[in-house]
């Protein structure tokens, strides 16, 4: 089963790249295109969370890419897989937001690291908005911006001190 899903996830990553990435895109544009694809195609598993039980698949890239339902770590694992395939350095970050555990990513563009939280940029996180227009509140942000809402052990991750996109 792992091999079958591994191949299917890899195939989906390739399909995403083929559908949203153009040859002349900059890495910034690639990151934005994948961010937007995730928001338009993956639904936050709000209903399972509300019921008090989130199935393990919602925590995985498989959940995000094949089932198209995930929570934060599923979004983040899937985003990281696509970035790796595009050869854009990307880290999986764990921490919290408020009193709840949370996961997001860091990406490296032009030699500098930035935070990116696809989950929190998804406008249907509360299960009500069907617009699917991406937010950019947590798109390529510095640690100083992220620390206002996200808590993490900075020493475990690259420094994100560029304020270029803040």
Task: Kindly give the residue locations of the regions a language model identified.
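Low-complexity, Gly/Ser/Thr/Pro-rich intrinsically disordered linker/tail segments
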Residues: 129-166
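Secondary-structure boundary elements
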Residues: 3-64
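Hydrophobic/aromatic-rich core segments of domains that either
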Residues: 74-144
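Non-catalytic ligand/cofactor/substrate-binding and regulatory segments of enzyme domains
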Residues: 1-13, 138-143, 151
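Short, solvent-exposed positions on alpha-helices
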Residues: 28-32, 73, 114
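Alpha-helix capping and helix-loop boundary segments enriched in small/acidic/polar residues
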Residues: 4, 66-70, 94
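Secondary-structure capping and boundary motifs in well-ordered enzyme cores
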Residues: 57, 64-71, 75
């Amino acid at each position: 089963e792992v091999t079958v899903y591994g191949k299917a996830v890899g195939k989906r990553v390739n399909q995403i790249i083929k559908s949203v990435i153009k040859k002349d895109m900059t890495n910034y544009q690639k990151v934005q295109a994948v961010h937007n694809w995730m928001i338009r195609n993956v639904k936050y598993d709000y209903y399972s969370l509300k019921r008090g039980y989130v199935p393990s698949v919602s925590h995985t890239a498989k959940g995000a890419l094949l089932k198209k339902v995930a929570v934060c770590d599923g979004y983040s694992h899937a985003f990281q897989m696509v970035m790796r395939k595009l050869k854009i350095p990307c880290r999986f970050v764990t921490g919290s937001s408020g009193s709840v555990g949370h996961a997001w990513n860091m990406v490296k563009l032009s030699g500098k690291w930035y935070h990116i939280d696809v989950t929190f940029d998804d406008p249907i996180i509360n299960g009500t908005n069907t617009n699917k227009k991406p937010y950019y509140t947590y798109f390529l942000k510095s640690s100083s911006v992220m620390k206002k809402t996200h808590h993490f052990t900075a020493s475990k991750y690259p420094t994100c001190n560029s304020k270029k996109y803040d």
